[in-house]
């Protein structure tokens, strides 16, 4: 018989600084066949993968990170260290007790433009206001048997299958950047998906 196996690992940190857009995947492939007798051969082709992804906002009601990168004005700093530096609307929101987010790595406020009010705001704010991830397992393969009871005739029975399971979670906190970029609510969502597919084929060839 013959046996082949391979293992592959991918760890892609994405284009956004930090760990908010990552893709990790561990996958394996097994191909094998064995001649049980002169007239029957069995085999399998099987692959399995386990993946884990985290992503940043690409679209949505409150802007997205990539638009924020392209539209924020060049005069706005990345951070404000003190509320006295805030734009007027941001100062008002701060005085009203709105949640002005800080970067958890340095304790500084995300800066917001004093010249432009749009629904995108600071790219780092778009990056950090939501935590979301998706993880799952995929299993797919084929089992087969080739039966040759006499010369020139082959009967094949083949069973193909695919099984998938995934879970996704997302969590957002209240925040304020400007009159268009804000949320007063916590948001939590979760979903689970399971699917399976199979196909059984039987056919014969005679040459």
What positions do the PLM features span?
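An active-site-proximal structural segment forming one wall of the substrate-binding cleft
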Residues: 153
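Transmembrane beta-strand segments that form the barrel wall of outer-membrane beta-barrel proteins
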Residues: 9-13
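Surface-exposed loop/interface segments of Gram-negative outer-membrane beta-barrel transport/assembly proteins
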Residues: 1, 15-21, 29-140, 156-207
